[in-house]
């Protein structure tokens, strides 16, 4: 078996390299020549204004809105009561805007949505991240369970009250159809209007896609981190949403029970992998940018992530090809001077220094391997290669603005060799070649059919590769959770 596996490697390693060479291109990064960005999306403006605590985000290459709020020139987050008339139930069961999508006027919703977008996002704004955070219900009937059962029950009552003569089977069938059709219309038309009004912004819904790999509490010893097969199937059915989105926004918030564990890495790894899978299938011409919501602290606490979990979250996301991390938090991050100082301590400690490390390494790899025309992604997603600057490099404070890494000539060559061993280039739109050194005029004009051809080939080869590994060497197809610094 060992000899057979070695023989397969001789075939598969060049194949892996070829697969990456025909991947659909990525969109260029939101900041030129900065392939991986870290954004701050916590409302911490009070720390500076009321408590005179400067979080010094810019110093560590962490990008924020000018006022450190959640609705600015860099990133906008629309919550349920801030965009149109989103129908939902409060936690105590009170309906708002009809409660369910089929009980709310879509035209009325869109009219208010247009006003809300115009008021929040200036017409001259050319780019930026815009996240719609609608979490109360899911557009797929079967995903409304637990606290979301109220949407199914209310939909059944809504249909039954209008048609008391119908059988229960017909009521169930029609209620599901009405809910799913109305939910889809709400989300799809909202995105369509948003893109019509602000076409250059990166629009998407928060937690789409989800992986539903939350069973680490139930079976911690046997936890794999993989998305359940039926949830992957459900995600595939949302093609209407993916093809309309211009970015994907999933999340990797870590529960404290996962602290510094292999399960934390498994949890993050497969959530990011699923988002990257959806990003590739969403469009014909390019892969959607994926931004990962994370937190600087463990859930429901102000305990900073450990160094290991910074690697598990920020490091893993960068290595798998995400466009960036969004560090999210609520008003509890700035409700007192003590809390602000805790946030500042985290940023000026391991979080900030690791943020500089990863963003610098991603930039260095893009420059060295991809001619600044692509981002570095792992040759194989299951490897343990990370975008880290060498320990021998030094951080210097440049122009009183931010830290930058300075690498010695000897370390530079060794680092480039190490990056070539673990990473390949994922070229930006209109660029191709092993080092993204060639530009295609056809792709620039948007006329070429090459991306679709490449997509079909890459999907076929990826499926073939996965099947070979699964059938021939299943025990070896495990994520290597050792770390490389």
What are these language model-derived features?
Residues 3-21, 458-473:
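Cleavable N-terminal signal peptides of Sec/SRP-targeted secreted and luminal proteins
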Residues 28-51, 66-67, 73, 78-81, ...:
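Substrate-binding cleft of secreted/luminal carbohydrate-active enzymes
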Residues 171-234, 268, 283-299:
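Aromatic-lined carbohydrate-recognition surfaces of secreted/lumenal glycan-active proteins
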Residues 439-460, 473-480:
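C-terminal GPI-anchoring signal of eukaryotic secretory precursors
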Residues 96-100, 144-180:
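A solvent-exposed, charged loop/short amphipathic helix patch at secondary-structure junctions
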Residues 237, 241-244, 249-298:
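Glycoside hydrolase catalytic-domain groove-lining segments
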Residues 61-63, 115, 227-239, 270-279, ...:
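Alpha-helical scaffolding within the catalytic cores
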């Amino acid at each position: 078996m060992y000899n057979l596996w070695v023989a397969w490697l001789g075939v598969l390693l060049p194949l892996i390299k070829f697969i990456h060479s025909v991947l659909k291109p990525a969109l260029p990064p939101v900041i030129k020549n900065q392939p991986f960005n870290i954004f701050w999306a916590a409302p911490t403006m009070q720390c500076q204004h009321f408590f005179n605590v400067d979080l010094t985000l810019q110093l560590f290459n962490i990008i924020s809105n000018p006022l450190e709020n959640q609705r600015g020139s860099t990133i906008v987050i629309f919550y349920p009561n801030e965009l149109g008339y989103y129908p939902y139930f409060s936690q105590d069961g009170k309906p708002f805007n009809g409660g369910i999508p089929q009980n709310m006027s879509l035209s009325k919703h869109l009219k208010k949505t247009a006003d809300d977008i115009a008021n929040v996002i200036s017409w001259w704004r050319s780019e930026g991240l815009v996240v719609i955070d609608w979490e109360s219900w899911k557009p797929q009937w079967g995903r409304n369970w637990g606290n979301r059962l109220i949407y199914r029950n209310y939909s059944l009552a809504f249909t039954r009250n209008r048609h008391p003569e119908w059988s229960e089977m017909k009521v169930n069938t029609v209620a599901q159809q009405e809910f799913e059709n109305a939910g889809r219309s709400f989300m799809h038309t909202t995105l369509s209007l948003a893109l019509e009004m602000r076409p250059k912004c990166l629009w998407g819904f928060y937690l789409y896609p989800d992986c539903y790999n939350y069973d680490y509490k139930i079976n911690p010893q046997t936890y794999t981190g993989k998305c359940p097969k039926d949830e992957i199937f459900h995600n595939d059915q949302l093609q209407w949403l993916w093809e309309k989105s211009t970015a994907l926004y999933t999340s990797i918030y870590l529960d404290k029970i996962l602290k510094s564990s292999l399960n934390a890495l498994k949890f993050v790894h497969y959530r990011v992998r699923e988002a990257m899978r959806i990003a590739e299938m969403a469009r014909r011409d390019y892969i959607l940018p994926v931004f990962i919501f994370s937190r600087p602290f463990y859930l429901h606490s102000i305990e900073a992530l450990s160094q290991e979990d910074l690697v598990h979250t920020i490091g893993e996301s960068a290595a798998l090809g995400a466009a960036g991390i969004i560090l999210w938090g609520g008003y509890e991050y700035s409700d007192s001077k003590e809390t602000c100082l805790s946030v500042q301590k985290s940023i000026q400690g391991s979080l900030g220094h690791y943020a500089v490390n990863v963003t610098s390494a991603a930039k260095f790899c893009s420059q060295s391997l991809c001619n600044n025309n692509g981002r570095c992604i792992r040759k194989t997603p299951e490897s343990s290669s990370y975008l880290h600057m060498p320990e021998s490099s030094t951080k210097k404070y440049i122009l009183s603005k931010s830290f930058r890494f300075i690498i010695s000539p000897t370390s530079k060559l060794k680092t480039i060799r190490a990056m070539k061993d673990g990473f390949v280039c994922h070229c930006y739109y209109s660029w191709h070649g092993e080092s993204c050194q060639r530009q295609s005029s056809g792709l620039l004009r948007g006329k070429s059919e090459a991306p679709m051809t490449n997509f079909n080939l890459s999907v076929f080869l990826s499926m073939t590769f996965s099947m070979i590994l699964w059938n021939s060497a299943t025990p070896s197809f495990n994520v290597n959770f050792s770390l490389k610094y």
